């Protein structure tokens, strides 16, 4: 306040705030102000402000602010059918100079999306991404963020139509990848360095570990309004692309190590030159494919937002539309090129691997400069690495099956069944995650989601997630029939389309997706209850399980067909 001589004075205030911090000691230095600004200055000192009309701002009854104003420290989540806006205040100002520095994991939930996932739990990727970190330094200006948004209402028919086109695109992409794999399996590198087959599911699984996770995370960010600001949008995009390149390089290297170990265990044979070739091929493929797919993914997300399409329905399948084809083509080309140089130019392979590994620090520096990805450099590796290991086990099954000349027909169908299963379960996981972000806070489940999870609960009901599970399951059989007929028309593969083969294949595909959607219903809610972001944690596990289940069920199906006499040795060879 100012004294009679116009000099500024210091006002000290002790206030008891009903929050976790107890007593708060504020020391506020006020310069000379005009009388007409005095009321606004007092209002700016209130630690909780609800942005409403100016005339309602002055209402006060019995010491309690009305029409949405709560006492200091009570940051209630307000649900409304209309858009609700919050005034986001600075925690540093709130804590003042009482000696308590604001924690990076302090509880401030101005809306559901800004919940801090590191609140006594493991930090997750969306923890840093979806929080409101951009607090203005001007304490006299209100920063308005959008609050609770309603999930877009969709009928089953609209949902199916939105999913159908990207689903078919993704399916044809996996069909093309399967035909490419059917061709390249006869190349020298695939014949002499069979561990490359172990790399195939692990590297194709990167779309589930990274691309689909990015797609689901950005889709959630779009639906809850976190990409409305251009600055915030590009911070999310640039930071996450740099982070994704770091993760892709590390996972590619670890996938090669896993392939070397899993390839060595059955026969006990080890080749150092082959190990270097695997590492270089894997790292280079992961880096290049991840960069290309990441750019495509960002374009899809931004385009979906501008056209009004729900990105949850289209982003994840489009992320996989050309992902398998791009990754497999790059892997085959690089590995074959390095293999031809193995004898004459032996130094080319280690130089290629060293070059892409040397780019990792640059990606770390870029990612560390963005608040959205800084914390993820120290966390979020668990699901990515675990999913890579699960996919590598599926690759070992594929390598073992392909080594049997009677079962080589499995090659063309493996990317198809794995890709389709992963696409469908990623859509469901992304939709459930968006629903939870809009209707609950991490650590707390909605009432309808509590209890034991069983298949009937996943597929029977009138909830939006029940309907999406039904739609996705109904797409399995007609979708795979289209893809099987496409493979038949292209005269690819080593298996003819007999009725018994179609029945066995469709049963394996249906069982895979049925199991994955059931697991997804439990897993997404499980991670949400644990306070972990399901966009970052569930999708890598689910797509990896899709690879493992698809490859295993397909291998069992081909063994069954061979036992009952449905045998085709060289169809389309």
UniProtKB/Swiss-Prot annotation:
One of its GO terms (biological process) is magnesium ion transport. Acts as a plasma-membrane magnesium transporter. Can also mediate the transport of other divalent metal cations in an order of Ba(2+) > Ni(2+) > Co(2+) > Fe(2+) > Mn(2+). It holds the Pfam family MgtE. This is Solute carrier family 41 member 2. PANTHER family: DIVALENT CATION TRANSPORTER SOLUTE CARRIER FAMILY 41, SOLUTE CARRIER FAMILY 41 MEMBER 2. GO terms for cellular component: plasma membrane. The gene is SLC41A2. It comes from Gallus gallus. It catalyses: Mg(2+)(in) = Mg(2+)(out); Mn(2+)(in) = Mn(2+)(out); Co(2+)(in) = Co(2+)(out); Ni(2+)(in) = Ni(2+)(out). It is found in: Cell membrane. Keywords: Cell membrane, Ion transport, Magnesium, Membrane, Repeat, Transmembrane, Transmembrane helix, Transport. The chain crosses the membrane at residues 163-183, 196-216, 246-266, 283-303, 314-334, 348-368, 377-397, 407-427, 470-490, 500-520, 544-564. Belongs to the SLC41A transporter family. It is a multi-pass membrane protein. One of its GO terms (molecular function) is monoatomic cation transmembrane transporter activity. The keyword Transmembrane applies. Residues 1-162, 217-245, 304-313, 369-376, 428-469, 521-543 are extracellular. Residues 184-195, 267-282, 335-347, 398-406, 491-499, 565-573 are cytoplasmic. InterPro entries: SLC41_membr_dom, SLC41_membr_dom_sf, SLC41A1-3.
């Amino acid at each position: 306040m100012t004294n009679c001589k116009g000099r500024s004075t210091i006002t000290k205030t002790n206030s008891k705030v009903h929050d976790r911090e107890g007593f708060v000691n504020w020391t506020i230095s006020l310069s000379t102000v005009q009388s007409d600004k005095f009321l606004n200055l007092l209002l700016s000192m209130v630690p909780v402000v609800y942005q409403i009309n100016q005339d309602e701002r002055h209402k006060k009854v019995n010491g309690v602010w009305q029409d949405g104003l709560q006492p200091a420290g009570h940051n209630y989540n307000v649900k409304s059918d209309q858009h609700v806006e919050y005034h986001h205040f600075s925690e540093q100002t709130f804590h003042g100079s009482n000696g308590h520095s604001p924690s990076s994991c302090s509880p401030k939930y101005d809306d559901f999306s800004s919940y801090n996932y590191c609140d006594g739990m493991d930090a997750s990727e969306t923890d840093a991404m979806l929080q409101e970190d951009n607090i203005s330094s001007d304490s006299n200006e209100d920063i308005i963020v959008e609050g609770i948004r309603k999930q877009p209402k969709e009928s089953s028919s609209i949902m199916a139509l939105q999913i159908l086109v990207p689903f078919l695109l993704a399916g044809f992409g996996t069909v093309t990848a399967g035909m490419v794999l059917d061709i390249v399996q006869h190349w020298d590198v695939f014949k002499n360095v069979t561990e490359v087959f172990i790399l195939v599911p692990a590297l194709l699984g990167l779309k589930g570990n990274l691309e689909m996770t990015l797609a689901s995370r950005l889709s959630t960010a779009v639906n809850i309004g976190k990409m409305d600001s251009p600055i915030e949008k590009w911070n999310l995009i640039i930071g996450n692309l740099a982070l994704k390149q770091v993760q892709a390089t590390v996972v590619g290297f670890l996938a090669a190590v896993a392939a070397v170990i899993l390839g060595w265990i059955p026969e006990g044979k080890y080749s150092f030159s082959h190990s270097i070739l695997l590492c270089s091929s894997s790292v280079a493929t992961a880096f290049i494919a991840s960069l290309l797919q990441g750019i495509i993914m960002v374009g899809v997300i931004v385009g979906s937002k501008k056209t009004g399409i729900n990105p949850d329905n289209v982003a994840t399948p489009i992320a996989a539309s050309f992902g398998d084809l791009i990754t497999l083509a790059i892997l085959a080309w690089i590995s074959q090129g390095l293999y031809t140089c193995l004898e004459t130019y032996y130094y080319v392979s280690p130089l290629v691997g060293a070059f892409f590994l040397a780019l990792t620090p640059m990606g770390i520096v870029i990612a560390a400069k963005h608040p959205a990805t800084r914390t993820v450099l120290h966390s979020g590796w668990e699901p990515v690495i675990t999913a890579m290991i699960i996919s590598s086990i599926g690759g070992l099954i594929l390598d073992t099956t392909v080594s049997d000349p009677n079962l080589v027909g499995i090659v063309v169908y493996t990317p198809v069944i794995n890709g389709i299963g992963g696409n469908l379960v990623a859509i469901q996981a992304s939709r459930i995650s968006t629903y939870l972000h809009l209707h609950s806070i991490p650590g707390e489940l909605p009432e309808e989601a509590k209890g034991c999870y069983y298949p009937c609960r996943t597929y029977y009901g009138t909830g939006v997630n029940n309907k999406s599970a039904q739609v996705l399951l109904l797409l399995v059989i007609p979708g795979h029939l289209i893809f099987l007929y496409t493979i038949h028309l292209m005269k690819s593969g080593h298996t003819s389309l007999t009725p018994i083969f179609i029945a066995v294949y469709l049963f394996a595909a249906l069982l895979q997706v049925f199991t994955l959607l059931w697991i997804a219903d439990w897993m997404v809610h499980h991670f949400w209850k644990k306070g972990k972001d399901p966009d970052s944690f569930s999708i890598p596990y689910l797509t990896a399980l899709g690879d493992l289940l698809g490859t295993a069920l397909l291998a069992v199906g081909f063994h069954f067909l061979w036992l009952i006499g449905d045998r085709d040795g060289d169809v389309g060879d």
